[in-house]
């Protein structure tokens, strides 16, 4: 099982210069290989096999950076091709732009060339770097690689990839379960009637973002004032992203600690984000990120996440009598049934999602437990 830990790092001036050169070399090798492969295929109809080593004689400055970072550029290009041929919607491999505000490179741990100890991280070519290690790492985990990134706000981070043994936990009897129904307004409503009460970080900052964007539009493109304002906007976006990520981590941890089984709907977030009615809410809520966090946290704890088919009519089924209500509009926020049941539409759906998850798993709920 792969586990990734992300920490902030504080490189000195020379290390920042090395990272900048490495980012540039990785981008250069990736783009060069992509261009040559495309050109060769157009001429011959065959696939060109090329490695970064080919370019070092012609471009000796490539030897100044970590060679494993260049090798990983080749692997990333191969992955991009595989993704495209497996599913064309992934898109054909594209050239990497120098203007991308987020830059990164990946290297591998070989013969102890990457070491983490005493608040410092050792990386190939860069040496020892100060790191903010805010959490401990199990000594049994094996370090396999590191990805160094520079975010749009000019802060540096490292993502350390560890390999751990697969947990041997297996759910034998589910004592606690919960269903979550995606909510545009509150992230989710659960099967006990609790609402996530999502803070909507993006919406709260929209006015400030719009103001900074207007200031940017008044700057001359390419000027120092323009670049300074652009970085200011990037820092604001990065701050919003960190707020969202922190909230979703804490919310998914709370649910994981309380429940053995979590049931959710399989929603196509890409399609929903393109809908004019949902776009901003889907982007702001981060439901896809939230379910990813839930998935790996539950897996590590030996617990279960069940995804219900997106065509399952969770909103239309009465959670009391089981009757299907065919006519139910999106604006109908209260579910009313002829049996007398009247409740919040999302809560009704969450109860049905939980029951369907239990049915799929083939277990019966022994006790109920609510998050306090």
Residue ranges and their predicted role:
Residues 1-372:
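Nucleic-acid substrate recognition interfaces
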């Amino acid at each position: 099982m792969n586990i990734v830990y992300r920490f902030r790092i504080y490189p000195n001036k020379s290390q920042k210069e090395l990272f900048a050169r490495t980012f540039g070399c990785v981008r250069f090798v990736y783009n060069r290989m992509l261009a040559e492969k495309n050109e060769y295929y157009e001429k011959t109809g065959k696939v060109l096999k090329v490695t970064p080593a080919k370019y070092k004689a012609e471009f000796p400055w490539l030897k100044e950076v970590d060679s494993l970072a260049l090798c990983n550029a080749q692997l990333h290009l191969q992955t991009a091709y595989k993704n495209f041929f497996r599913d064309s919607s992934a898109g054909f491999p594209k050239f990497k732009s120098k203007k991308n505000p987020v830059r990164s490179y990946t290297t591998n741990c070989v013969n102890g060339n990457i070491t983490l100890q005493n608040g410092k991280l050792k990386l190939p070519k860069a040496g020892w770097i100060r790191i903010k290690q805010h959490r401990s790492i199990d000594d049994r985990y094996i370090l396999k690689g590191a990805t160094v990134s520079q975010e749009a706000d000019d802060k540096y981070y490292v993502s350390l990839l560890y390999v751990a043994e697969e947990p041997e936990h297996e759910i034998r009897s589910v004592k606690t379960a919960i269903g979550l129904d995606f909510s545009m307004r509150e992230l989710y409503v659960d099967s006990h009637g609790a609402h996530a009460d999502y803070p909507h970080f993006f919406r709260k900052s929209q006015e400030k973002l719009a103001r900074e964007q207007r200031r940017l539009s008044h700057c001359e493109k390419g000027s120092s004032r323009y670049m300074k304002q652009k970085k200011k906007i990037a820092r604001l976006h990065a701050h919003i992203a960190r707020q969202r990520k922190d909230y979703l981590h804490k919310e998914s941890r709370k649910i994981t600690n309380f429940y053995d089984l979590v049931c959710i709907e399989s929603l196509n977030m890409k399609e929903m984000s393109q809908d004019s009615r949902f776009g901003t809410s889907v982007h702001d809520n981060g439901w896809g990120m939230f379910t990813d966090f839930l998935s790996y946290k539950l897996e590590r704890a030996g617990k279960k996440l069940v995804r219900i088919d997106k065509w399952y009519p969770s909103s239309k089924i009465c959670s009391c009598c089981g009757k299907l209500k065919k006519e139910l509009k999106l604006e109908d926020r209260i579910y009313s049934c002829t049996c007398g049941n009247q409740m919040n539409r999302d809560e009704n759906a969450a109860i049905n999602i939980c029951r369907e998850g239990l049915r799929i798993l083939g277990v019966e709920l022994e006790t109920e437990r609510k998050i306090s």
